[in-house]
Amino acid sequence: MSTSFENKATNRGVITFTISQDKIKPALDQAFNKIKKDLNAPGFRKGHMPRPVFDQRFGEEVLYEEALNIVLPAAYEGAVAELELDVVAQPKIDVVSMEKCQEWTLTAEVVTKPEVKLGDYKDLTVEVEASKEVTDEEVDAKVERERNNLAELVVKEEAAVEGDTVVIDFVGSVDGVEFDGGKGDNFSLELGSGQFIPGFEEQLVGAKAGDTVEVNVTFPENYQAEDLAGKAAKFVATVHEVKAKEVPELDDELAKDIDEEVETLDELKAKYRKELEASKEAAYDDALEGAAIELAVENAEIVELPEEMVHDEVHRSVNEFMASMQRQGISPDMYFQLTGTSQEDLHKQHEAEADKRVKTNLVIEAIAKAEGFEASDDEIEKEINDLAAEYSMPVEQVRSLLSADMLKHDIVMKKAVEVITSSAKAK
């Protein structure tokens, strides 16, 4: 196989490569074996036409497309490897010549990884907004959240106030006509929770059990149901019960109810302080590391980032997001209807982060190369075992899912990140 590369522009070029007859002939045989089972010709049972007869009647050229599909991937990858190119997007393949008994010649328009000119990435000083300090107010707020989780709803006769829960039947209409989804029975609604559209809950403040309240609201312009968006609506709500939230006393008994490992409220607060300190310490470290990596990327120069790299990352990110939605039972159509957005909107939402991730990965890869990082067999084995433990998977299953090249890449990337973050300091 002969190969050549012609540079057309920054990070773009054309590979010309050939496929020899010793690769083409087996591919033609495979192509014939694949299609012959469906061949039905006079004088032969279906699927039993000999190859010479096929070539005579139809010409082997009929097999070229299928044979090319068979032989092309390895031929293209071989050309890229021989030329030592770092290709980052799907190529555009064109056939130059496919003559009988001769080598085939093809071209591939490719996009290559851009050059990264590194700036400072060690001993960086960065702004960190996160704080390690834990205040008494933060500890008290955590206790209060747990206290509220143990609150009970108690029926009251007085008028509803914000924070109370009302049990209501309601019927909604637009221009006197009821609409789908506008009716509910025995619905528990916490006033001030924002469960309903703006203005609804506020109009139930002051209501008592047995009251019927007319609620007038306007649906938001971006409401998910397009036929209701921006329209004025009237709801008739019948209040069955008003319930107040009754929280337990803030004392040692409450502390024991919250956490059976403590005996007093002071012990609970001390435990929460330690937990918050550990959490804020981790958040601070993450913020410091993130800021250092961001500065290292800002200090570097990426020579003409190919748009294809960002496009591919956007596509990957959107697919991952939609897969997570579907695992929650939300189809793409349902998501777009609920959010009032489109596929194009979703791609735009992911563009900025995708651009940032691509640039970050390029810079970290460049640092790993500059530092000469490699991954030893022992490090690869440790990475496999760590992943198996993290995801509760058999070691051999992890080994089968991840190639050695993928593992090596992850290891050297971690080493490069460590170079940036280990020497970084906060201002």
Curated annotation (Swiss-Prot):
Top-level EC class: isomerase
Pfam families associated with the record: FKBP_C (PF00254), Trigger_C (PF05698), Trigger_N (PF05697)
Alphabetized GO MF terms: peptidyl-prolyl cis-trans isomerase activity; protein folding chaperone; ribosome binding
Domain of life: Bacteria
Reported function: Involved in protein export. Acts as a chaperone by maintaining the newly synthesized protein in an open conformation. Functions as a peptidyl-prolyl cis-trans isomerase.
PANTHER family (alphabetical): TRIGGER FACTOR CHAPERONE AND PEPTIDYL-PROLYL CIS/TRANS ISOMERASE, TRIGGER FACTOR-LIKE PROTEIN TIG, CHLOROPLASTIC
Domain remarks: Consists of 3 domains; the N-terminus binds the ribosome, the middle domain has PPIase activity, while the C-terminus has intrinsic chaperone activity on its own.
The protein, known as: Trigger factor
Biological source species: Streptococcus equi subsp. equi (strain 4047)
Organism placement in taxonomy: Bacteria, Bacillati, Bacillota, Bacilli, Lactobacillales
